[in-house]
Amino acid sequence: MEKPEILGIALFPALVISTLIIALSCGPNPPFCPQGCTVEIVNPLDDITLGNPNSLEPSNRIQAFVTDPEGFAINDVRVRFSLSFAQQNSLVVDTNGDGVSDARALQLVDPDRCKPQPCDLIPISQWFQQGAFVDSPYTNLTDDRGVAEMIILISGKVSVDPATFEASLDNGSVDSFQFSVNSQ
């Protein structure tokens, strides 16, 4: 064997091993939930009737609780939230009167995106600038208590019956509820 041929044979395994070491040292990313974990929506919404059809009103904060097979809270796992009428192309509300729909009937809000104060403590008009409005479906991580949270913003101009909210894990565990929004 010639010298370049031997160098090539020795270099290839070293390259493969170093690539594996680098890839494995990145840690458990993405944070998938182990098999047997479950998700439960703690506070599902009931039907909502809005008093002022021209307002934007935040609904309750929705919490999804993730547990391992033994029933203990599990942190830093992905929870996928999905809300009907809140997808990227679900524009059904005309906000400026020009006859063109330019807003969603329901809007998902990530409460962790408002900084330095939580979204609950700042006016709704600032949520967009903070980047808190997100498209459905949206993935969020659980905190150290096993809870992932979302806020649903409701436009009072449109009736929605029924809307479906779903929280799911990558292992197939799903919890959902239906509710309706009706203007008076």
Tell me what each language-model feature is.
Residues A23-Q184:
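The feature marks long extracellular or luminal low-complexity segments
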Residues M1-S25:
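Sec-dependent bacterial lipoprotein signal peptides
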